[in-house]
Amino acid sequence: LVVIAIIGILSSVVLASLNTARTKGADAAIKSNLAGARAQAELFYDSNSNSYDGGTATSDVCSATGLAGTVKSIHSAVLAAAAASGIASVSIDLTTGGAAGVANCNSTAAGWAAQVPLKTTGAGYYCVDSLGASITSTTNLISNNTDVTCS
C-alpha cells in the first residue's frame, strides 16, 4: 500500500512537470513564430517600395492576403503564434478593439507591430515590431489601431 502511494505521488509530480514543459514549449513557439514574422515583414517592406502598406486593408503586411510581388505578408506567422497560444484568429488593425487575450497585428506604411498572449498563466503578452523590439509584458501593448510599436 505504501508503494502504491509513493508511485501515485511520483506520477503526479511527473504529470505536473510535463504540463509546465508543454506550456513553456508553447511560449517558445509563440516567440519563434513572431521572430520569423519580423524577418518576413522586412522582405515584404523591401519588395513593396519601402512600405508595410499595400494600399488597401487586404494587402498590407498584416493581412491574410497581403502580397508584395511574390512576398507574402506576416499573417501566417502571427496566426501560427496565435495557434500556439490557443487562439484561432488574428485581429488585424484591432478589429476586436484591443481586447485582452487576443492576437493583434497592426500596420501603417511606416511600421507594424504584432502581439500574442503567452500560454503561461500570468506571463502576459509577447510583442514584436518593425523597430526590432521583442518585449514580454504583462500589459496589453497594442491597445488601439494606431499602435505600431511595442512601447
Predicted regions mapped to residue ranges:
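N-terminal helix-rich module
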Residues: 59-62, 66-82, 107-110, 143-144, ...
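N-terminal single-pass transmembrane signal-anchor helix
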Residues: 1-18, 22, 26
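Disulfide-bonded cysteine motifs in exported proteins
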Residues: 56-57, 92-100, 121-122, 144-145
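Alpha-helix exit/C-cap motif
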Residues: 35-64, 80-89, 93
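Short, surface-exposed beta-strand/loop micro-motifs that present aromatic residues
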Residues: 89-106, 115
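Membrane-proximal extracytoplasmic alpha-helices
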Residues: 21-40
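Short, surface-exposed interaction loops/tails
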Residues: 108-151
